[in-house]
Each structure stands twice: as C-alpha cells, then as structure tokens.
Amino acid sequence: MSSLVEVFSTGGGTQSCAISCLIIEGKLPRPDYVVIADTGREMPTTWQYLDAVVRPAFKEIGLEVHRISKEEYAAPWGRDIFATSGHLMIPAFTTQNGEISKLSAFCSSAWKAEVCDRWFAKTLGITRSQRRYWIGFSLDEPKRWGRMIDGKEFKSGLIRLPLVHDIPTRRHEAIRIVEKHGWPKPPRSRCFDCPNQSDFEWAEVQSDYPKNFQQAIERDETMRLRDTHAFLHQSAKPLRDVDLKQPDDLFSAGCPSGECFL
C-alpha cells in the first residue's frame, strides 16, 4: 500500500469533472485532497460550475475542494505576466523573427503546479516527493501526457493519470460520464486572456464577459509596452482590432504543455 498523499488536482473542466464523477461513484479511489489553482484569470464559468455542482457533491462524501491562490503562493519571480527576468510567462504569439511564432509557456507550471506545491508545503508540511498528483489528461491527448510518462516524477509514482491508465477515457467519453452522472455539461476551463483560445472562445469572452475581455485587451496592450512583438491573438494583431465573428471550431485550440483546458 502506498504511503503517498493522493491529490486530485482538478482543472475544473470536462475531464476533471469526469474524474470527480468517477470518484463519487466509487469507480476511482478516494483521494486525500482535492485542489484547484486560482490563477486570477480563470473564466467565471469555471468557478460558477465548481461552486454550484462539484464542491457540494464532494462535500457530501467528506471532501473539501481547496482553491489555492496564485497571488498568495506563486514564486515572487513569476507572479506577473512578465517574470522578473523579463521573459513572458504566457505562450504569447510573437513576430520577433519576422513571422508569427509562439513563445514557450511557463504559466501552467508556475501558476498552477508550483502554487499547489507551495500550499501543501507551507500549510500541511507535505513536500512534492510525498504526494501523488492526479492530472486529468484524457486518453486521446498523447501529446500532453506522452512526455510526462517519460519523466522522472511519473516513473517515481508521483503522477497519476486516471483517464489514461486507471479508466482509459477519451474526451467524448468523459462528457458522457458527466452526463450519465446527472451533472450539467461542464465549461471548458481556461484563462480569459489565454493565447491558446480559439476565436470561438475569444468571441465568447467578448460577448458574455465584456469586463474580462476588456481586461484581456489591456493585458495585450500592456505586453507591448515591454515587448512590441508580443500578442495574445494568433493573428499577431492587437486584440481590440481582431474580427472574432468568423466561424471556428471550439476545440481547435488548446495547450500541449500545461494543465489547462482540463
């Protein structure tokens, strides 16, 4: 029997909700803790669903969902959109080399995984080597979990992928698990200013959450005060000037390296 502390790190989206249902139904073992990182940029729909559906369901089986703030637990060097070293934390689009390319993403690790690590260490005295994180990658996302299973933490048993190894599940099957459980359809979790959004998702922020969209515009413009080549939108145009009315596939975008959109 493992002595590791079992931690379900929920992203608040479809795959994470499927794992939640499987835990509640007893098809997955009960974790010791359920946590979710609050980046300060999450779409309001994620918190609305979490508070209305997920949190009460876990409470019924004696589990609390711990919402952990980036502002309180992120490392001082990486709390803002620009790190203290000057590099961007988010995977913005850049025209630095004369054509549109994409920067590396540091936000998921610095604003989610490491934030939860510090909370466990400071609050409970549990170190990274003493816990096993459950992450909600689904079976049809090998680009996201493939590199992870080759890593030291997975090989040391510190990472668990319930929808890959315990109950192999594809995203469309995760949706059915949630529906069969009787929960409403979960939102697609993401930050409202994430460069990985499709135009469909940007348009949703613009129409349904205008205050958040204005915040995204301000951050887009603030980035270029320090880096004139950086843009939030894939067109490498200022966000306020982008036509978001063209049709787009809801699931055409996503992050290949982080723990978002889960």
Stretch-by-stretch model annotation:
Residues 1-262:
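Nucleotide-activated chemistry modules centered on ATP-dependent adenylation/adenylyltransferase
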